[in-house]
Amino acid sequence: MEPQILFLYLSLFILSLNFFFTNLKPRLVRLFQPSLESRVKTALLSRKEVAAFLDSPIVEDEEGEEREEEEEGGIVSNANFTFEFDPYMMSKAESVNKALEEAIPVGEPLKIHEAMRYAILAAGKRVRPILCLASCELVGGQENAAMPAACAVEMIHTMSLIKDDLPCMDNDDLRRGKPTTHKVYGEGVAILSGGALLSLAFEHMTTAEISSERMVWAVRELARSIGTRGLVAGQAMDISSEGLDLNEVGLEHLEFIHVHKTAVLLETAAVLGAIIGGGSDEEIESVRKFARCIGLLFQVVDDILDETKSSEELGKTAGKDQLAGKLTYPKLIGLEKSKEFVKRLTKDARQHLQGFSSEKVAPLVALTTFIANRNK
């Protein structure tokens, strides 16, 4: 495909997606919901697996228990090496922050660029870009090759947060310990800055020095994760599910929301890293399955924290899901079962990495533990 045609398609996609995000509620959601509900069964866990989980307690095997002990304190070790996760996380986050600082423009239009920088340079965990970098290195790639994609994923994640926080969506005033973008710059500037981040993400990712075939593959993966097979689908179902009676929905309904709204971008981050790193089809599929597990894991933990932590501890408004009548795992299956689900997803995620060497996989194993044990 000619670069000019590819750019035109991307531009049209970005403009239509930005319009969809900002005009989603409530009319389009009502039109969108039936088709979404018909696709709930494509979510991560099957109905039988969910039922089996709810009917039986989690039983960790001896190997799982031993591994938990080995990872205690952010350290993964075996007889051959020791991996310390905290220094790794800090180093990767610093590299990502530096790259983001350089990637976001500073000139005119000043207000838009200020809002973009305000939103994206706030103190975030950078889990998604770090996942991208770690997945690239897992299959033999280099950090610098995956950095443009890592930044692109963080730009899109930040765009989604800006949109989520708007009064027409989740109506939140606090994000990453600071007032949300629309509270500081107004709704108009917030919407425009989100659209600009979305556009910049694709532009920036194309600076990666990889083959044209892998670039098209990566662009397709990223675009798919944002639209009606990704973020938009999850957000649409989430909004349309507010206030539903628990008897009207099942666990697969909730899972559809979170697989598409939260897990999809974590999955995409990992897949992009593996694509750019030169991974084989088999390696990329293993990474995809792993990341899908930790993406859902991230959301289950988020639901637990929303119910058990304060706004000061979280850096965002606590208890907002309950107030808005949103579906959450604790609400649907209870707090204890939700915690057991965390253990199950953690174990499943690790199993998808068994084909890789212990040393190369250590950052992703430790990242899984970090996500499962995070407190904000």
Curated annotation (Swiss-Prot):
* Listed GO biological process terms: carotenoid biosynthetic process; farnesyl diphosphate biosynthetic process; geranyl diphosphate biosynthetic process; geranylgeranyl diphosphate biosynthetic process; isoprenoid biosynthetic process
Task: Write down the EC number.
Answer: 2.5.1.-, 2.5.1.1, 2.5.1.29, 2.5.1.10
Specify the enzyme's EC class, one word: transferase
- Kindly indicate whether the keyword Endoplasmic reticulum belongs to this entry: yes
User: Has UniProt tagged this entry with the keyword Chaperone?
Assistant: no
Which key words tag this protein in UniProt?
A: Carotenoid biosynthesis, Endoplasmic reticulum, Isoprene biosynthesis, Magnesium, Metal-binding, Signal, Transferase
PANTHER family (alphabetical): FARNESYL DIPHOSPHATE SYNTHASE, HETERODIMERIC GERANYLGERANYL PYROPHOSPHATE SYNTHASE LARGE SUBUNIT 2
Which family is annotated?
Belongs to the FPP/GGPP synthase family.
According to UniProt, the name of this protein is Heterodimeric geranylgeranyl pyrophosphate synthase large subunit 2
Taxonomy of the source species:
Eukaryota, Viridiplantae, Streptophyta, Embryophyta, Tracheophyta
